[in-house]
């Protein structure tokens, strides 16, 4: 487990064996790697014993001179076209009534991968878990790897 620079270049070189990344980043990285090396072996999955999920956020400046521009941007993101655009970038649509073309759907992980994914409810606990993850991996996984 590498908690440092998880760039496409390092993944492609094989310097990173396991990386913990958001699904859309992982799928995008895999796409880039496969374009450069179609024989590469790069698997993306959501841990079946549990994972976290999070949504995007938007910061809207309440002092802006154009307050409706942010509203229009949000309207686009939630529109069918906006949701499709996000899915083309490997992000799962937040709306479940959006019809995705088969070629776009094929580039996303199947819904059943997210069965045990949960939202972060305690940010402080999450921050601590992230801090402890690398050492726990070394002690509890790497130490027993052969």
Feature locations, PLM:
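Conserved C-terminal helix/tail region of periplasmic/extracytoplasmic solute-binding proteins
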Residues: 9, 111-146
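Mature extracytoplasmic/periplasmic domains
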Residues: 52, 56-118
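Extracytoplasmic/secreted proteins, especially bacterial periplasmic and envelope-associated proteins
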Residues: 6, 10, 15, 28, ...
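Ligand-binding pocket segment of bilobal, Venus flytrap-like solute-binding proteins
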Residues: 1-43
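Periplasmic-binding protein-like
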Residues: 1, 38-62
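Structured segments of extracytoplasmic/periplasmic soluble domains
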Residues: 10, 14, 29-36, 63, ...
């Amino acid at each position: 487990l590498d908690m440092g620079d998880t760039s496409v270049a390092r993944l492609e070189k094989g310097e990173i064996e396991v990386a913990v990344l958001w699904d859309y980043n992982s799928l995008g990285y895999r796409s880039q790697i496969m374009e450069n090396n179609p024989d590469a072996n790069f698997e993306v999955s959501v841990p079946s014993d549990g994972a976290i999920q999070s949504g995007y956020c938007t910061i809207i400046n309440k002092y802006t001179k154009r307050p409706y521009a942010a509203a229009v941007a949000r309207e686009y993101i939630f529109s069918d076209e906006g949701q499709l655009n996000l899915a083309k970038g490997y992000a799962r649509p937040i709306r479940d009534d959006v019809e995705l073309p088969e070629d776009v759907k094929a580039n996303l992980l199947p819904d059943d991968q997210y069965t045990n994914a949960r939202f972060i409810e305690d940010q402080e606990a999450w921050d601590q878990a992230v801090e402890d993850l690398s050492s726990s991996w070394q002690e509890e996984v790497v130490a027993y790897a052969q």
